[in-house]
């Protein structure tokens, strides 16, 4: 069951991933790729560091086996993100636990599936935890050219 709505006006074509283990094409509900962008201000950096460490330590273990990557803490604006943030890559089956940790931290976050439509991912398909922030949509990839796909689970740049 996907937790993010697809708008009635527009359908987003599901992304086909290559399985990490056996090379077969893969796109199931439990393996659907997600990103969380977790934002912080300088006064919240210690809280962000604790959450970053907690996610890093849990990565690949137990209920967090589907958390594949915890990115660097970026202390400045990067891409469409207007303030410091770090990124977490995970499969949908980790979504409830990742959301619980983020909510408990009190930090704002943008959580979205990863499809071939970067704009939809960051707008109509996303969910905000905390106060939404204005994103710079002009730097997002055009539909069908999402660069986030190639770096999923590997890199945040």
Model regions and ranges:
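N-terminal amphipathic/basic-hydrophobic helices that include classical n-h-c signal peptides
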Residues: 1-26
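Long, contiguous binding/interaction regions
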Residues: 20-157
């Amino acid at each position: 069951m996907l937790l993010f709505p697809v708008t009635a006006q527009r359908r987003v074509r599901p992304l086909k991933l290559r399985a990490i283990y056996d090379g077969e094409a893969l796109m199931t509900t439990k393996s659907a790729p997600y990103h969380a962008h977790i934002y912080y201000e300088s006064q919240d950096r210690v809280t962000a560091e604790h959450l970053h460490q907690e996610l890093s330590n849990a990565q690949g273990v137990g209920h967090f086996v589907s958390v594949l990557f915890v990115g660097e803490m970026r202390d400045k604006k990067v891409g469409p993100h207007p303030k410091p943030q770090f990124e977490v890559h995970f499969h949908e089956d980790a979504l409830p636990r990742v959301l619980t940790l983020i909510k408990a931290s009190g930090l704002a976050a943008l959580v979205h599936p990863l499809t071939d439509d970067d704009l939809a991912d960051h707008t109509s398909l996303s969910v905000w935890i905390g106060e939404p922030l204005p994103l710079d949509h002009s730097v997002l990839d055009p539909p069908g050219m999402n660069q986030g796909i190639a770096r999923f689970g590997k890199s945040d740049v």
